[in-house]
Amino acid sequence: MTKLREDIRNVAIIAHVDHGKTTLVDELLKQSHTLDERKELQERAMDSNDLEKERGITILAKNTAVAYNGTRINIMDTPGHADFGGEVERIMKMVDGVVLVVDAYEGTMPQTRFVLKKALEQDLVPIVVVNKIDKPSARPEEVVDEVLELFIELGADDDQLEFPVVYASAINGTSSLSDDPADQEHTMAPIFDTIIDHIPAPVDNSDEPLQIQVSLLDYNDFVGRIGIGRVFRGTVKVGDQVTLSKLDGTTKNFRVTKLFGFFGLERREIQEAKAGDLIAISGMEDIFVGETITPTDAVEALPILHIDEPTLQMTFLVNNSPFAGREGKWVTSRKVEERLQAELQTDVSLRVDPTDSPDKWTVSGRGELHLSILIETMRREGYELQVSRPEVIIKEIDGVQCEPFERVQIDTPEEYQGSVIQSLSERKGEMLDMVATGNGQTRLVFLVPARGLIGYSTEFLSMTRGYGIMNHTFDQYLPVIPGEIGGRHRGALVSIDNGKATTYSIMSIEERGTIFVNPGTEVYEGMIIGENSRENDLTVNITKAKQMTNVRSATKDQTAVIKTPRILTLEESLEFLNDDEYMEVTPESIRLRKQILNKAEREKANKKKKSAAAE
């Protein structure tokens, strides 16, 4: 008879971005009294990174533990976005079941689908929590049917299809086993009880030889590299001599210097851990994800964890613009390279490859969001850098060149569906499904080449007047579609001079396109200051001041009225980029520029390119 550790449950929480997963975990922490009463719980307690709190997305997987009626429930928070899919797969290895959180109105979404597929493939036991049941537009019955359909589509087995459902409103701290909002009670007990009753307890084989697999990495200045993982069997104590089986097949011996267990949101030092525990372990500097820790006299590595390959790459380079070094703290190639290498310590879905120049690196990741978060994080830390336009990674599969395709789900008011369908068809998208969801809304599902989506979201938002919602996630690699897809249809307005932008110049340039800078902004030759309304690039002088001829004209300029400029965010700037442009990123500014700043040199290079293409 297999012994079980009935005092532990290991679960992962899965949800689409913004379906209330982090709020739900906060409520579980609060109601299990795991957090110290004196400490006021911050909202979104599990999102520790500023960017996560601002954007309402979870990037790094977090783990926390709550105690309920003598059982310890280890909860792994998963990123809801497929760009962070590398993390998702590894978390699934650490748990025995998943809690799927779905919005009672929105239902299942593409990212939910990605994460859920990974969970079902690992034979994990699912529980469904229908959240936001208090919404006036909630449609719990239909949503549960949608979840069931999704499970069937993803190949769930019969046991997985018998999932229990709990209805909740995490923000109000209520839950119930009934789908009637009137039956909600101010307690999370139904969720706790369902987890304990349905999620299997880990096997207790703590008397067998030790096996721990590292699923996540962390870094701490005091103890160095920390491996986070599950004890699959055996017992480990501080001071033990153990062996690390590396990914390349070699082994290294080390001594366990510290062990940490998870309590609430804290890590606390512990002296020993047994099979079924989730722990953090230190003592080995070059420990990596997927490696196995075993006793020195019984080395037996677990199968290596597969990590999703990157699908998108871009060039990162040292800032060499005329304004380089003005606003950032870290500007040299050595500092930028050190920072990228440090990111590799914890982000295993990222790749950084050197190029033929010491000032440039090819950085590959899982998608635009993955890379833009890295750029934004570096910018906040005081780095200056430039990046090129993102491009997809082409892979050879069975001798055929293949490119990544994404599954796109769009919710839009009916009147815009025609333009959305047309625009995605132009980007070589194939429509898989179209459903009227009521209230004049339509849901469209497409399969689109990933390069067709680079730069699409800005166009999509203006096309649907901001009412459309688009979600997309990597689907598969398919043979490359020949020809250009997507890209910008309009040229850039490029500054021909150095100086400050003036209201007088902006007034005369406005009719040529959309301006990106305010009067008084410093510009340099070759900097992009707007978007042309035509296809070609146009060089303009935005620094020209009005010639004053007499006293009366001096005040006349003050009445000049110009349109509010369109200030681009980091994501919009990335989307705007063309192949011959860079985005310059500093702690204070985001600027777009031509790779070749001088107009005459640019024209010479373009001529060369055209004649080479004609040959």
Q: Where do the protein language model's features map onto the residues?
A:
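Structural and coupling elements of P-loop NTPases
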Residues: 1-615
